[in-house]
A protein has these predicted regions:
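Conserved catalytic cores of phosphodiester-cleaving nucleases, focusing on short active-site segments
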Residues: 39-60, 71, 77
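Acidic-basic catalytic patches of nuclease active cores, encompassing PD-(D/E)XK
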Residues: 1-30
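Short acidic/glycine-enriched loop/turn segments that link adjacent beta-strands
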Residues: 35-37
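Hydrophobic "anchor" residues on beta-strands that sit immediately upstream
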Residues: 26, 49, 94
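Domain-level recognition of nuclease-like catalytic cores that cleave nucleotide substrates
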Residues: 87-123
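Short, solvent-exposed loop/turn elements at beta->coil junctions and helix N-caps
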Residues: 30-33, 102-103
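Mid-chain, well-packed structural core segment of small domains
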Residues: 62-95
Length: 123
């Protein structure tokens, strides 16, 4: 991953965390890693454990951030959620997986928009 992509990703994750806190979420951890992958943000929304995938883009040339959640990524997110819940003995706790889509200006690196989609893998 290039340094520019890393920077854009970091900007997106920081903006997402700040946005979620403004919405009343309590951030538990950022960049939770386990053998099968990484969860960008884990937070609490009242009594619900929320695992949040952050997708950051500087343009829509390769699709929107939401469109970047492939079937394989969805399967991995489900496995990551199960792994986290089991590791922390939270299997009986309500849980959902959300997406925070962040658009960043390519030149200034300023956040242009944030879109929060709750329960992206429901249904």
């Amino acid at each position: 991953m290039t340094l520019k992509r890393q920077l854009v990703g970091k900007i997106g994750e920081e903006a997402a965390a700040q946005y979620l806190q403004q919405q009343g979420y309590i951030i538990i951890t950022n960049n939770y890693r386990c053998p099968i992958g990484e969860i960008d943000i884990i937070a609490r929304d009242q009594r619900v454990t929320v695992l949040i995938e952050v997708r950051t883009r500087t343009s829509l040339a390769y699709g929107s951030p939401e469109e970047s959640i492939t079937a394989e990524k969805a399967r991995r997110l489900k496995r990551l959620a199960l792994s986290y819940l089991q590791a922390y003995h939270l299997s009986a706790t309500p849980c959902r997986i959300d997406l925070v889509a962040v658009m960043v200006d390519r030149e200034t690196h300023q956040v242009k928009s944030i879109k929060h989609i709750k329960g992206i893998l429901n249904g």
